Amino acid sequence: MNARITSSAALLLALTSSLAVATCESDAGAILLYPQTTPERPEIPSPHRLADGTEVVVALLKAGSWAVVPVTVENGPLNLPYGRRGTGKGRQLDVDANDFSTLARTGLHSEDELDRTETITGKPVAEITKVGRPEMASGAGFMAADEDIISVLKGDNRLVRRLGLTHREMARPLFHIWNLMLKEYELHRIGRDWDNVRHVEYNGKTIRFGEVHPTRGFQESIFNDEIQGAWQINFFRELDEREWAFLREKYAHLDEARMGELIRKLSHILTGEMEPYYVMRYGFYEGHTDYRVDPIAIAFIFGLKSLEEIEAAFPGQLHEVLTSRFTRSCLPDR
């Protein structure tokens, strides 16, 4: 591994210090971990860090029982058979310090560094942009036809900064969802599709799943890295009455179609397992494609920020910010 890639130990320390989950020194021996289940909901927060450092989420299973699922974000082996390559946690803690030293140090990009960037992982940014466009490396693409890799990195960095968060904080709940799926796959509870979990609780929010299934073959990365994709992951959360009322008041000028678009982009994510690695390592959420993991949607769905806090960061602009592409001439305000 490149010596300039952030060390796992250093990043793990940073993640541990910033993780907003409760820790109970006496809980490690009292909580039953999945695949063991309980008929009643365990009385712990979700997400939660046990005294031994294990990160867990609370899930309601299809059968009606409750599970405390270990979902620790960590580097791990690709030891689960999947096709010819295998799958597993891989390098979840890595950040590309070789290209983005400020990202590795602070969790956010320096725009000066981005302006000077000519290659990422040794690959020219023009080539990354070319293969990332629709109908190149993938049908949907990794960015829109008028976006480029630097404009997308800048645009999302501005969104995350305005939310008062970091890219590693954004990556963590995405990894928790992926690690939940890996646990299910390890237990042979995922086949052509997956419907064993009714919902996951997260910061007081209820995360539900739509269609989740493996795709045909593997999606290769647009960077020179080992990241690959083989799953379609679909999750969302429903707005509560207070949130509906808040948006109707703040965005009363939107017609029904645009309000529906705002709600959909705010509360629903369709993606794959490549994205948490991309967010952690590069601060890359994909451009405005079908598989984008928008930072605003992550913050809303997983309760990293309240709707009021999100609106305060983008007053009156949520529909525009969620739908506008990141071109060189059209980026969100800093």
Predicted segments with their positions:
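Alpha-helical interaction/linker modules in multidomain eukaryotic proteins
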Residues: 23-334
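Bacterial N-terminal signal peptides that target proteins for export
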Residues: 1-9
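Bacterial N-terminal signal peptides
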Residues: 8-18
